[in-house]
Amino acid sequence: MKRYLLPLLVFVVLAVFLAIGLKRDPHEVPSPLIGKPAPAFDLPQLAAPEQRLTTQDLRGQVWLLNVWASWCVACREEHPLLVEAAKTHHLKLYGLNYKDKRDDALAWLKNFGNPYVLAISDTEGLVGIDYGVYGVPETFVIDKQGVIRYKQIGPVTPEALRDTLLPLLAQLEQAP
């Protein structure tokens, strides 16, 4: 009887870890940046590279930062939803074009629509690294004080927009 106890105990422990892992949403990878100030950036605008956008320019408003690239297949999946959401919900959505060629990114926005208030260019990917980007697309919600409140990994889905992003944006807009 005792010889079966150890394998049974190991099996139960492994089953518990598996159950915990299966309950987690793969799009909700914990980020050490949640609740911390958004990393500062000063980047050229995609459409007008001689002009720049900084995090300081966005202080005092709730905004979304969508990290995307023209070479990103999943970005193409979420893009129509972002275009529609920007129109219907008047989102303050800023695009961080990640490790991309400017001409490719501009052509992509021309072909598929531009949901962004402004798109900025991170050709070297350094700002993406500061934000802890695993891959594109990723979307961040940043509050009026410049603090990251949420990170969406992967494409924004209609469910994520309806159930998470829009309620959080409304809540943050009401905050002082």
Positions of the model-derived regions?
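N-terminal targeting signals for export/organelle localization
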Residues: 1-44, 176
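Short pre-active-site segment immediately N-terminal to redox-active cysteine/selenocysteine motifs
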Residues: 61-63, 67-71, 135
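C-type cytochrome heme c attachment motif
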Residues: 70-77, 138
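Hydrophobic beta-strand core positions in alpha/beta domains
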Residues: 64-66, 95, 141
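Structural microenvironment flanking redox-active thiols in thiol-disulfide oxidoreductases
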Residues: 76-113, 123-129
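A short beta-strand-turn-helix
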Residues: 41-64
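Short gly/ser/thr-rich secondary-structure transition/capping motifs
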Residues: 23-25, 44-50, 119-122
